[in-house]
Amino acid sequence: MKLAYWMYEGTALSGIARVAGSMPKVHTVIHGPQGDGYINVMFSMLERFHKLPPFTLSPIGRREMARGSRARLVETVRRVDALHQPDVIVITPTCSSTLLQEDLLAVANSLGRQTKARLIVPQVNAFRDLEHFAMDDFLAQMVAAFAVEQPKTERFTVNLIGPSYLGFHQIHDLNEIRTMLEEIGIGVNAVIPYGATVETLRSLTRAHLNICLYREYGRETCEYLRKRFGIDYISITPMGIRQTGRFLRALGEQAGIDVTPYIRRHLAPSGALARFTKSVDALSSLFGKRAVVFGDFSHAVGATYLLREIGLQVVWAGTYMTAWKDEFTEAVAALTDEAFVCDDFQAVSRKIRDTQPDIVFGTQMERHSAARYELPCIVISSPAHILNFPLFPAPVLGYRGMTRLLDTINQTIKLGLEEHLVNMFGEDTASERQMEAASAAARGTATAPTGAAGAVATVDELQWDAEAEKALKQVPFFVRGKVQRNTENYARERGYSEVTLDVIYAAKAYFEGKGNQGNR
């Protein structure tokens, strides 16, 4: 158990809710305090449920803490069975029920004869297990409870294991993967947990192959199906040119299909990907830019591949999945200078501050950190804000997901419509007003005389002369703050009291030289 006021991963309850809440006719009874009802809010807000999410709280209050909560739980389960008539009722433990040492399995065994629904208690540790570990274990538990041997489909089909509610663009990814499979001639037998019923779980064994789309969870389910029913699986997240190619070739090998024409068609010189990555525009705006990446395992590795493929330099790549430190380090070793594994968001924020990259790729927390340091940021992984649960199709996997990401990267790094409007109508930002105030103060106070190289500084506050101010205003607004900081740091280190045009050019040459050395 860890005391924190912000975490990258949710609790075991969050993981169980993501699996159970993604499955129709499965209702979850949460045996915990009133605060654990937050699950309903998450589903209603982020996934925009048009009906009440399938969760019912069996509240633990002061009375239950004193007398025991078994009677309240039994009453809640009976009410859910009669009112909602689900196929499965999941009785999930929480930290509070664990503290009370409630035997939920005994409750389920005794109640199972009285309910129409099948009762299942997730075998997780509410204190120790985090979101993705609980998802992995519970999904495998559900599959083991219902999967039975069935004859294979005549056509080569696969099971897609991974897509769920509250995942990062996962429903959009599911639609993209479905389309990709249909285009190469492979059918989809089942998808779990999203949209999966008890009958879906029973029919999993009809597929010829399982696909684990995300490293975070689903692998245990694939291992169970391989050992119990002999169904092989592949575990590749198709994000980026190389990873998507690996994914397709592995599929083609299993299905006996030649996928080379499909890959060539999407990577052809006339295709959107090739036109973008080889254009003068992309080379001038993207090539050599310094980026940092942080997120869950799958998206951090995939984004690192993609960025290297389009010419960005990944200074470091990181993940908050500390249990897979060695595996992650090996996965990105050839792609970046440093692998950074940490689940402390403040340490990640400090590392971004010290690196000062041109662009940040991360979670919602890295978006906040980047905004604090005036750096552009793209969210590529959960945890994410509601902005990253769009209604319009927005995959990140496959070739179409790649083109969408490239658009986002290009728009974030380069000047867009906003800058054109600024050029047309002018800009009156807080930083500009502060500079004007500093300039006015400088004109009212005496400063040390400056020569061609500048004078020795007597105060920490640097002044900018009129020509330097004019030059700074011509710098694109989204990097203006960084240029100002770098120039002032350069001036202070060399003892200048005033920033002149000569100082700006000298600082520019200095930092460009450092960048070129880093690229070599």
Swiss-Prot record:
Cofactor note: Binds 1 [4Fe-4S] cluster per heterodimer. The cluster is bound at the heterodimer interface by residues from both subunits.
Gene3D superfamilies: 1.20.89.20, Nitrogenase molybdenum iron protein domain, Proto-chlorophyllide reductase 57 kD subunit B
Domain of life: Bacteria
Active-site residue list: 281
Entry keyword annotation includes Transcription regulation: no
Description of how the protein assembles with itself and partners: Protochlorophyllide reductase is composed of three subunits; BchL, BchN and BchB. Forms a heterotetramer of two BchB and two BchN subunits.
Protein name: Light-independent protochlorophyllide reductase subunit B
Gene that this polypeptide is encoded by: bchB
